[in-house]
């Protein structure tokens, strides 16, 4: 029931966005959402993209259903908002600074909503689908790039393929719908690249003759752009802080201003000071006086006392070690040194997430292992028939006792991979990572440590780029 309520709320927000888009007046140069008829060619071309690969992606997502369908609706909303921005750009000149940021804000917020949905549904059986979308949805941000938006979209498409390959591997021989889903989704970004190359090679093409685009009056600002009236105007400034002395202070202030208003005549009330009353001309008077007091210090605004505000207590997620379908979930474990998974099967996978200072042993033969967002994790396993992936982690140590064909290290700082004699042919694939070492067993039972290269040199040989490892003598 709660899931249904969440879906209804998300759909209401999406409808609110699109209604606000469609009601924005062209006179304000806000987001337009007029039909393609009469639109400039690049808006018509974008409509063709929406009607073909996007429509196919939505269709396949609906057939799969569940989280995939919900996620697709969010993506569709983002594309609709982008289409509206294209209409605006075709009619208006580009605004500067913060005004441009205001126009881009709804798209940015929708991108964040897509990413957040994946983070909130890490236990979903369609997690690879959600990850493919989440890792690439930032491609919608090409409209904010001043140069080379096409390569940026390609980079996001490549990020999606990291996860779509997993989807294909899991469903290729099981359910063709998922294969078609991958094809439809990736085609959105490949066609968007071609679209950008044709119409927006050096950035979003704005009108040269229309009025300057203004801040959106039809879309309220906030963490989530939704339906509803704009926020009320700010209230009146707070009244001045009353002083503690009450009517006496008021009377004394009145008297002070009355004296000031006298102008030059105020000096008539001053008394004449004779020489015998001046300390610099009467040494006896100077000796009688005490130490000279310094005058009042210049006024400085009092510094507010900065008392450390208590930080809101971060909600600690429950620790998990459970089998969900064919997936072993090991999550949020901290300072545990004796975790063991021994009841394994060949078709099972293990997903290890947000574990800190923890040691886990996986016995038997398993399909694949993923280590995500872990710190100071020790992982020991027997055999993996697929791949061991380490993503977004720090200080991870992995030891294979049997055999593993591939170890993938991505966005990780600090990884030690201890290989067994049966896994010396293991492939180590790394990207955006540092401090990686592979340890090879010796005859005496020890290990020899070999660092994985992190620095490369690329040269053009006249026909292609040639990349070699750069060795730094130390």
Swiss-Prot record:
Compartments it resides in: Cell membrane
C-CAP/cofactor C-like domain sequence ranges: 312-452
Alphabetical list of PROSITE patterns matching this protein: C_CAP_COFACTOR_C, CAP_1, CAP_2
UniProt KW Ubl conjugation keyword: yes
Modification type N-acetylalanine: residues: 2
Record PTM N6-methyllysine, positions in chain: 286
Keyword S-adenosyl-L-methionine: no
GO molecular-function terms, A-Z: actin binding; adenylate cyclase binding
Ranges for region Disordered: 215-252, 277-316
Modification Phosphotyrosine occurs at: 31
Record-linked InterPro entries: Adenylate_cyclase-assoc_CAP, Adenylate_cyclase-assoc_CAP_C, Adenylate_cyclase-assoc_CAP_N, C-CAP_CF_C-like, CAP/MinC_C, CAP_C_sf, CAP_CS_C, CAP_CS_N
Top-rank taxon, per record: Eukaryota
Residue(s) of cross-link: Glycyl lysine isopeptide (Lys-Gly) (interchain with G-Cter in SUMO1): 347
Residues where N6-acetyllysine is found: 80
Keywords (A to Z) from UniProt: Acetylation, Actin-binding, Cell membrane, Isopeptide bond, Membrane, Methylation, Phosphoprotein, Ubl conjugation
Biased composition (Low complexity): 216-227, 243-252
Phosphothreonine PTM positions: 306
GO biological process, one term: receptor-mediated endocytosis
GO cellular component: cortical actin cytoskeleton; cytoplasm; glutamatergic synapse; plasma membrane; postsynapse; presynapse
Membrane topology recorded in Swiss-Prot or TrEMBL: Peripheral membrane protein
Pfam families: CAP_C (PF08603), CAP_N (PF21938), CAP_N-CM (PF01213)
Pro residues composition bias: residue spans: 228-242, 299-311
Main localization, broad class: membrane
Subunit and interaction comment: Homodimer. Binds actin monomers.
Family in the record: Belongs to the CAP family.
Name assigned to this protein: Adenylyl cyclase-associated protein 1
């Amino acid at each position: 029931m709660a899931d249904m309520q969440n879906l209804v709320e998300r759909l209401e927000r999406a409808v609110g966005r699109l209604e606000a888009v469609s009601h924005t007046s062209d006179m304000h140069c806000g987001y337009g959402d007029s039909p393609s008829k009469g639109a400039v060619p690049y808006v018509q071309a974008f409509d063709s993209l929406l009607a073909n690969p996007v429509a196919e992606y939505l269709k396949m997502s609906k057939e799969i259903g569940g989280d995939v369908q919900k996620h697709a609706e969010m993506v569709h909303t983002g594309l609709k908002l982008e289409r509206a921005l294209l209409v605006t750009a075709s009619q208006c000149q580009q605004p500067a600074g913060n005004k441009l940021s205001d126009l881009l804000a709804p798209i940015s917020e929708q991108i964040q909503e897509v990413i957040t949905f994946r983070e909130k549904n890490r236990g979903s059986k369609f997690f690879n689908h959600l990850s493919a979308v989440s890792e690439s949805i930032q491609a919608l941000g090409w409209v904010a790039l001043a140069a080379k938006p096409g390569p940026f979209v390609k980079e996001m498409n490549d990020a999606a393929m990291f996860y779509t390959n997993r989807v294909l591997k899991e469903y290729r021989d099981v359910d063709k719908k998922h294969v078609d889903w991958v094809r439809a989704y990736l085609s959105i970004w490949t066609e968007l690249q071609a679209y950008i190359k044709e119409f927006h090679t050096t950035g979003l093409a704005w009108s040269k003759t229309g009025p300057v685009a203004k801040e959106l009056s039809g879309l309220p600002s906030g963490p989530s752009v939704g339906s509803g009236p704009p926020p009320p105007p700010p209230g009146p400034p707070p009244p001045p802080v009353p002083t503690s002395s009450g009517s006496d202070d008021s009377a004394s202030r009145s008297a002070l201003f009355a004296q000031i208003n006298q102008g030059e005549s105020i000096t008539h009330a001053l008394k004449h000071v004779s020489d015998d009353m001046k300390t610099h001309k009467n040494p006896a008077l100077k000796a009688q006086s005490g130490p000279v007091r310094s005058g009042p210090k210049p006024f400085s605004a009092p510094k507010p006392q900065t008392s450390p505000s208590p930080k809101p207590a971060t909600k600690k997620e429950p620790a998990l070690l459970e089998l969900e379908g064919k997936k072993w979930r090991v999550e949020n474990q901290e300072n545990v040194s004796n975790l063991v998974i021994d009841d394994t099967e060949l078709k099972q996978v293990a997903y290890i997430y947000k574990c800190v200072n923890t040691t886990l042993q996986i016995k038997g033969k398993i399909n694949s292992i993923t280590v995500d967002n872990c710190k100071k994790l020790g992982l020991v396993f027997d055999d993996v028939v697929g791949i061991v992936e380490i993503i977004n982690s720090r200080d991870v140590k992995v030891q294979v006792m049997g055999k593993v064909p591939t170890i993938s290290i991505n966005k990780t700082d600090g990884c030690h991979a201890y290989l067994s004699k049966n896994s010396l042919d293991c492939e180590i694939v790394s990207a955006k990572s540092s401090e990686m070492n592979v340890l090879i067993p010796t005859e005496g039972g020890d290990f020899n440590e070999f660092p994985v290269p992190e620095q490369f040199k690329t040269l053009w040989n006249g026909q292609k780029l040639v990349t070699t490892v750069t060795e730094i003598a130390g």
